[in-house]
Amino acid sequence: MDALLPRSSPQLKFYLNGTPISLTSPHPRWTLLDFIRSQDGLKGTKLGCGEGGCGALSGKHVITIEGLGTVDHPHPLQERIAQLHGSQCGFCTPGIVMSLYAMIRNAYDPVTGKFQLSADDIESKGHLDGNLCRCTGYKPILNAARTFIEDDLGSVPSIVESELVGTEEETESDMGAHSGSGDTGSRSSGSCGRPGGCCKDSPGISSCSSRETDMTTPSLPDSPVLKQYDFIPYTPTTELIYPPGLAKFVPELLCYGDAEQAWVKPRSVQEALEILSQCPSATLVTGASEVQVDVRFKDFRPSVSVFVGDITEMTGISWSEDMKTLYIGGSASLSDIEAECLRCIPLLKAVNLGSESVLSAIARTLRYFAGRQIRNAACLAGNIATASPISDMNPLLLAVGATVHARTSAEETTIPMSEMFKGYRKTALPSGSLITKIAVPMPSKDQIEIVNAYKQAKRKDDDIAIVTAAFRVRIAPGPDYTVQEASLAFGGMAPTTVLAHKTASALEGKRWGDEAVLDIVLTSLGEEFNLPYSVPGGMATYRRTLTLSLFVRFWNYVNQKLGLEYDSDLIEEIHRGISTGTRDDDNPHAQRVVGQQIPHLSGLKHATGEAEYVDDMPPLHRELHGALVLSERAHAKILSVNWTPALERGAVGYVDHTSLPEEKNHWGPVVHDEPVFAKGEVHAHGQPIGLVYADDAMTAQIAAKAVIVTYEDLPAILTIDEAIEARSFFNYGKELRRGAPPEEIRKELDDCEYTLSGTTKIGGQEHFYLETNAAIAVPHTEDGSMDVWSSTQNTMETQDFLSQVTNVPRHKINARVRRMGGAFGGKESRSVPIACIVAVAAKKARRPVRIMLNRDEDMMTSGQRHPVQCRWKVGFNREGKLLVLDADTYNNAGYSVDMSAAVMDRCLTHIENCYYIPNVWLRGWVCKTNTHSNTAFRGFGAPQAMYITESIISAVAEKVGIDVDEIRRRNLYQVGQRTPFNQVLDEDWHVPLLLEQVREEADYDARKKEIERFNSEHRWRKRGIALIPTKFGISFATALHLNQASAAVRVYTDGSVLLNHGGTEMGQGLYTKMVQVAAQELRVPVDQVYTQDTSSYQTANASPTAASSGSDLNGMAIKHACDQINERLRPYREKYGEDADLGTIAKAAYRDRVNLSAAGYYKMPTIGYEWGNYSENVKPMYFYFTQRQGVACTEVELDLLTGTHTVLRADLKMDIGRSINPAIDYGQIEGAFVQGQGLFTMEESLWTRSGQLATRGPGTYKIPGFADIPQVFNSSKGIGEPPLFMGSSVLFALRDALSHARRERGVSEPLVLDSPATVERLRLAVGDDLVHRAQVQRKDGEQGFFVAVA
């Protein structure tokens, strides 16, 4: 490389939002994200997972969210996302906006001046499969995107017209929240004001072509429902996409770096080979999507990185003259390959069906390869060279006989794919070689050659494979359909991608279509892939089943092509349709402001990237960055900690348990049993040992990884079963009982006509808020006070423990939070130690200290929803009437109590759900294990409890042979009956009515009959439906002291209002709702009321924003304050008239020395339950159940061959009384449903045997995406935690589908379906012959690779 250095340049030149950038020797470890966020005013681009990479930017134009628009001058897309309620917490919104922007701009045809965009393009082409949102349920985002569909491609779908709702009254001036609307004429003329530049600032430059076209999208099609939305028209030709300076850009050989790492960007293959000849171990990158994961999670540090993504010789895609070979450049993007295949399929279909088969297989495989952003950057050569055993593309390349062309400085070699893989992550590529192209042969047009490829993952879109397969078969012409040649390739079945040689040989020479031949193949595959129970990656039986199932799918596919008998269910995978749905927007209680569908007050800030989260705050003078040192053992003694290597790598200092007194080193929301810093012993993988701090975040991370900790391992308990066996419990000891006393409950069971016993398990759930835990501690050396910004739901607890660890009185600690990028309970307590740790560091360093956890750090340290196991016995009669329930319920607390006891409280009090059982004895156990400490999560133990009940109901229905809906109906609570904790269900108990309403409105009975018909006609596709009720108690249950709130309202003499309260904004729209309350009470527009942030200085002793009580508590406190002010202003309203504005009234009152500020306070009345008090006079535990009851009706379709499913329709109905803001409440119910859908079907947390969390990033832990939401999504109002359990209706609908399948196959054993109902569990529960063939027996002492801790 020395010879190249004199010819190289260290300058990286590109454009950023229209501005030329020239960087000299940038940091070689920087990603594009690192650079963008280091620039002033460019914080809209967020760190979501840290698993992507940037490649190189030389000669590119980078557009960020700030380059599209601002709050004052938003891009039409940004405005529509905000106005149509497409954001809640807003952290994901900039990324989603940019993905939509790319889709919309690419859909623009400069020749016709039209947007070639349809609903199918938006939902089915993968444009959004790399984006995740945890809050909204995706529906409003899709609605906003659909407003760009033009009339000539079909009008905006009816879903938009039915959901972009409102009344003309909402556009009046007192609805100031509609700040995005305005005079569209003035806003679309002249410069658009975009920071990235506008073409009207530079006349004559067109963004798409030299042809000037003034094309704008209509605001929306004419519709009386939509006329209130005066959206900004979209004029794409006003956007500067290609800066003129790029036309003059001359590529240079780029080389920069430091003593540890160099980054090189050659211009040609020859330059790349010269580099490799001198540095044969250099790391080649194009998208860096694989390398960056190793850098982030495996501490991989390439000494030389060579970017080959812009070498023209390697990015092309071409055909041989005879069209018999497709040549794919090694660096050609996967998106380009997909596009080329789609372009050629119709051209070749008429002349060469074999070629069409190959190209279709490639295109289909690439469609579900990662996400769109990855496909735009990643290349095929990288896929081959990394040699992943679960590669999507390698089995297909192997099956079709592709060859790899590789060059070194000395020679060019051609390697057949069949000889490429030599071992796990090892290839036959020569040292220092470069893959220049891949040759994909096409079948001869006179041959009958059929190819297809398959992939099975936990989720359809953007997921790594469990098993991949590709099959090719050549059939001899003639009526016998003799197999001349076969190739069967699999990924996920061995350390490398492999060919099933034995099976292929057994197939060759046989007659295709003969069922006996199919049996031979299946037997041979079972022998060839005989996985052990302990196979790395786990799922041994499921993976073996898939090898058989996927071949059966191919067998039927070939039969169809040959005109033989086939089953269509076995050919096509489940494909979802375009999503639709309705909302019931009748709101008879709407007032002038309260009850109106006002957009989230920060919606435009979210959509433009201007919303500021903790880590977006500008850097402070002399600020330091922290990085945690975490335990790498589940349970061990700490023998020594050597901090010296960290200091040598650039750390300024560190803190650990020696940095604060022993008595200050323990915290906990209830019991102070958790060390802030581990001392002497660690009790979980990921437990904080210390923190190093440095001048920048990257140095801090490197230094933290350099710390050497020596351990002595101790036995670890991971699962609930292990905790029960070891009697490892925290002190809890609570129970609930009704009817027969405990000593007689067993006799009552024996006296029942029927009894059943069982064990029900439900796994945990990662919060997966998009903004990880973050905090900034700012010490004030003058007086010892401290400001701490934290992403927390709980300013009071944060303040309390900050005071403890810094030894500073609470009145000198100001805990502050402006907004969170999601929380869901996960930042009620687990944010506290993060703030405490940086505060200790800030006090020691006497400088501000900042931290934002990486995704894996956050997942390892922050805890999850509690895994729960219930061991139950139930007694009932032949009519299915429940009589007795005797149950032990266990939750996995982790290594500290945190809020696990309170979670168990709610679990026990919701375990009967909506059903009256006269005799119950319920006991709770809180298990102590060596996993991270589990914590609050939306629902707080109730979803797990209600799932147990519904599982019991299903088991009872199966036992007595009565329809499960009838069993539910017969056991429903009636008005006047009492819960096991003696709370009366009064006249507001509406669940029986809601069930009947949903049954009628969802056309349930007719659909159930149609499902019976469908299932009778489809052996390998089954549909199911479920109608699930729920109730949820509102209040902080037995933490009575938390059921209070205070607020401060200050009126200024111009009529503006400052509002402070203790509630925190995490995306649930609390700030918006509270502003509405104040605006309603003080009779002002919402834009006259301002809430800056939540601060312990402004609102002392604030209860956490949790338990679905934020609006109830804080809203009433605000009303109390406003009532006081209104009473003081009453004489002035009488004097000046009811129509007088608040400014006039306030000014007059001020001159009369009237106090224009008030402190409000509210405590929730009537509650105060005492555990163990079974008298009928005991105070209620919950303030109410009414207005938070709900019913969900969900229909699914299940592919029995793979376990994949789709949600065909969901109808949700909740009684929430008088909604403050229906639009926000809709977002809550739909988002909660999708989150619940994830809990019960997809989100599976797994640990390694050593106690390390295996699912600690989006690559291994999957939450629902855009393609997972119900295809028809109908909802009525809801809010907060209660709607989450409605997501269980998906699982019970799947259970219904499985029941049909099992009855058809004669499976008589009771169906046990633990949660989550993953593709693995669903497939294996079918109980068919393929599963029996593939069954892997567990040998004595053999353990599974992963551990599920429920």
From Swiss-Prot:
Location of the FAD-binding PCMH-type domain: 256-445
Listed Low complexity bias regions: 180-192
GO molecular function, one term: FAD binding
Binding site for substrate: 828, 906
Entries under SMART domains matching the protein: Ald_Xan_dh_C, CO_deh_flav_C
Cofactor note: Binds 2 [2Fe-2S] clusters.
Activity-pH behavior: Optimum pH is 9.4.
InterPro entries with a match to the protein in the record: 2Fe-2S-bd, 2Fe-2S-bd_dom_sf, 2Fe-2S_ferredoxin-like_sf, Ald_Oxase/Xan_DH_a/b, Ald_Oxase/Xan_DH_a/b_sf, Ald_Oxase/xanthine_DH-like, AldOxase/xan_DH_MoCoBD1, AldOxase/xan_DH_MoCoBD2
Keyword Iron-sulfur in annotation: yes
Protein name: Nicotinate hydroxylase hnxS
Upper lineage: Eukaryota, Fungi, Dikarya, Ascomycota, Pezizomycotina
Gene label: hxnS
